[in-house]
Amino acid sequence: MEEQKPKGSGMEKIATFIVDKRNLFFLLYAFALIFSIVATGWVKVENDITTYLPEDTETRQGLTVMNDNFVTYGTARVMVSNVTYETAENICSDLESIDGVTSVDFDDTTDHYKSASALFSVTFDGTTTDDISVHALHTIRDMLAGYDTYIDTEVGVDTSADLQSEMSVILVLAAIVIVLVLTLTSRSYAEVPVLIMTFGAAALLNMGTNFLCGTISFISNSVTVILQLALAIDYAIILCHRFSDEHETKDTREACIAALSKAIPEISSSSLTTISGLGALAFMHFGIGRDMATVLIKAILFSLLSVFTLMPGLLMVFSKKIDATRHKNLIPKITFLGKFDVATRFIVPPIFAVVVVVTAVLANKCPYCYSYTDLVTAKQSESQIAHQKIKNTFGVNNMVAVIVPTGDYDSERQLLKDLDSCAEVKSTQGLANIDAMDGYKLADALTPRQMSELAGLDYEVAEALYAAYAVDQNEYGKLISGLGDYKVPLFDMFMFLQREMKDGNITLDGDIQETLDDLFEQLNKAQLQLQSDKYSRLVVYLNLPEESDETMDFLDTMHALIAKYYSSDTYIVGNSTNVKDLSSSFGEDNLLISVLSALFVVIILLFTFKSAGLPVLLIVVIQGSIWINFSVPTIQHESLYFLGYLIVNSIQMGANIDYAIVISSHYTDLKKEMRPKEAIIAALNEAFPTIFTSGTILAVAGALIGVMTTNPVIAAIGTCLGRGTVISIVLVMAVLPQILLIGDTIVERTSFDVKVPVDLSRVNRTASGNMRVSGRVRGYVNGVIDAEIKGTLNGTLNASVTSGTTIEPTKPDFYLPESKEQAAAEWAENYTEGEEV
């Protein structure tokens, strides 16, 4: 069939081009999807959440210094339960003999043996990702397979891979639920594959372009696909239903063009609230907000693109199947709920007001936490179970690193001594307090005589060694004044001796050489962990939890102690400092997101409804759902990870507000045709399928994430999102209608109109049957009409009019005869929504 030239408005021309050039778009999508499949492998995922801390925080700066200057070897806490102390000693010996294990700390103190359980602190020869460490850990697991063993370690743990595996299972389960929901809410069974293919293309395009962001967080990488589906599936459903409506009176091509031209502005407007809510995340000081905002907004934009450019072609291809598989409406009417809302319009709002006030106070007292180490998820990994078991038996193991400028062993020694004297400190470790031999510490300064006695060297050899060291350090004055009182730190002298032996400048006897080689190996590892050219690292083990008021206060005490010996360029790094930095920025980020997300949504609603009052009413309901949602942790006395609040807050305000918009839009339109009480009942019936579809998908997706992932951050987001969506649905269905009814006066008095030019150029159209008319019409109409009319009528008027309507000439018959009133009622029941003439 020859394609017709596009007619009408610019939007119709765009729609015509997309529909007629669908094969071109299919080809472009094929290339884009193949590219995206390949490009998904280019995406870099960041698993360390501290990477997104602001650059000016102590933790971020300290981590940068620490990672650039030191090596951190892998460690493991291995607990073996139900063993005697003698058995534990044998196990310790076996662990020490494993290749790849540097050391095993174990003794008869309660720190390592308690309640018939032994705790071994294992240090590996490599980092957490090195093969030697991973292989050694596997050997430990095999060796202890016959014991009741719990191993808490980060060695060999691939957080990203584990999370992706969990999310794949969640996505499959979510897809099953989605197909069931779409089947229930669809008008034809063949619509479901169209919707799934459209979304699948959008999701793949988004994943395939994530590499453009450089590196994305593990949070964005794991939850974006499911959130994209839950947030954007409405767009495809709107176009699908538009096409179904238009196809009642038009052929496939014309119906698709008409549906797309009307759906583009409608869907674009609907997406603005979601995008604005997500956009608020980008203003967070914590970089994870910008990361999630970028990836999720990109996901929404790709969803829009797929709906506008791919889905019309799919509708054309599946048109016959859609017609052949139509089924009756499977979603029941909820007239009973509408009648309940009408009957309780003076009861529910006051109760809701009280609930909002109470939950606002409770939400403000929500017990937020900033470390997820001790959070317990519904599903726990083997490592999490081990961590809890060891914690319950031997207590916390809270380690922080103190980084100071290198070169002043006396200050390091005194600082470590001051820290050891604090009751909050379990133990400390640094070059200045590590035992060497014969009671000496590594940082102790020795004379040539003391060195000769310690190392078993002739005094002349020791003196020559000291002379060489003085020359190497350009301390020629020591050679002139005599070397007898010249003191050199033991660690520095050993490292100098190693360099000289390596260069062949010094040769020692075989036995001494072998002894020193073993010593040098240990010293090299100590230096890699504790000293660089610029900094020294002191390790401090605290008797405090990672997150508590006492811990935060003691960090201030540590800063004060450090300041006694160092004026600048010092850092404290650890999970506790991370908690302190995150908590200090949370208040500002929280206020910023709450205000911006609400402000963006209000501005959009203001111009959508052309009323200042209605947006406020909608915001009150959704903000109420947010407060109720986050009052639950307070009531349950459960800690909530702060990111769960920040992210879900913006999603609820940006996405759940759509449920309120749908009901309000239908109500605003319907109350022009019927009384407000009847309009709100009809609005609920019309809006329920949309809310049921979107709400069920988002709630189920959130619930699945919350109960099926072991990652505490992701679980917190999922739990809060699922619970918040359910609360939002309940409020918009059982509270918002009452507020709209009693708030009509406010809405009407705060309404305004935006004058826009009217294009009077029209083509003649002919149609018959049941139809909805929207726009300027000039010509002859024969039938029963129910509409707002402003203009000139040349003929006979026989109709019921609302109060305030002016008609000339006077005394027309304002009321329909009973038979025509019945005909009008039948027309209202059977008209085809969306038909325009």
Tell what function each PLM region has:
Residues 1-47, 101, 128-371, 546, ...:
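Membrane-embedded transmembrane helical bundles of large multi-pass transporters/channels
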Residues 2-4, 8-30, 37-41, 56, ...:
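Structural signature of multi-pass, alpha-helical inner-membrane proteins
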Residues 43-57, 367-380, 498-513:
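Acidic/glycine-enriched edge-of-secondary-structure segments
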Residues 52-54, 58, 69-75, 83, ...:
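Juxtamembrane segments of multi-pass membrane proteins
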Residues 56-61, 68-69, 81-123, 158-161, ...:
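Extracytoplasmic
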Residues 65, 387-391, 414-418, 522-528, ...:
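Generic recognition of flexible, low-complexity loop/linker segments
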Residues 74-82, 92, 107-164, 398-406, ...:
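A short beta-strand structural signal in non-transmembrane regions
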Residues 393-397, 423, 519-520, 528-534, ...:
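A structural signal for short secondary-structure junctions
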